[in-house]
Amino acid sequence: MKKIFFNSSLPRSGSTLLQNILGQNPEFYVTPTSGVLELLYAARSNYTSSPEFKAQDFETMKSGFLSFCLGGLESFFDEVTDKPYVMDKSRGWGIHYGFLNSFYPNPKIVSMVRDPRSIFASMEKNFRKNQFMDSGMVNHSELVGTTTEKRIDIWSQSQPVGMAMERMYQMFREGINEKIHFIKYEDLMKNPAHEMNKLYKYLEVEPFKHDFNDIEQITHEDDSVYGIYGDHKIRKKIQQLPDDSKSVLGTHGYNWIKQNYSWFFDEFKYY
C-alpha cells in the first residue's frame, strides 16, 4: 500500500524545489502542481448537490462517498507510479485538511513558507521581467496597478498570494497548523540536510542522502498556463541569494507587508 503525502505551500516559497529534492530519492514519486484535489473537490460538490444521493440513506451514502474518495486517490497513484511514496503538490490540501482527513485519516502535510516580503518581491520581479506580455493588472488610464505599492495591494487581495496567506491565517485559527510540518525557505537554503532529515522524521520515512549541488528537475509543467507568474524552474544548486526584497519593494511597501501580516511574522518568527 502506497503512502501518500501532501505538499501544501505558499507561492514563491520553494515548493517545486522541495519536490525535486525529494525526487532524488528513488522511493518517491513527486508531482508538479497537481489536479488530484480538484477531482475530489468536484466529486464532493456533485455528491452534496445531487438529489439522487439526498434521496437515499444519509449514513450509507456518506460511507460510500468517502470510500469513493479514498479509492480514487489511491487508484490514481497506483496507476501512475509503482513507487511506495507519493508527494502530491497542491496549495489547497492544507485548508481542506478536514475534507482530506475524512477519508484519508491523519494525513501528513508539508508546507514551505517564506518571508512574505520575499514572496511579494518575487512577484514584482516576475512582473518586471515579463513586460512583453500584458499582465492584466495594469490600467494606466484608471491608475490601477501602476506602481509597486498598488501591485502589492492587488496581490494581497487576490490569487495566488492573497488567497494563500488568508488560508494560512485560517489554518492557524482552526489549529490545522499543529498537524502540518512547516519548512522555512530560508532554513532550507541555509541547512538543507538538516531540514530534509526533519522532514523524513515527520513523514516516518528512512532518511536519504541528497545531493544539494546537483538537483535535476524532474517535475515539468507548461508555465504559460499560469501567466507571467508561472515560474516553476529551479536552480541545480541550493544556495542562499542576497535578500533584495527591500530594494525591489521600496521602504513603504516593505514595511506595509510586515505590518499587514504581523501575525505571520509572529508565528514564524520573521523579523
Residues covered by each model-derived region:
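Short catalytic/ligand-binding loop motif for oxyanion handling, primarily in non-cytosolic enzymes
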Residues: 16-19, 37-40, 94-96, 117-122, ...
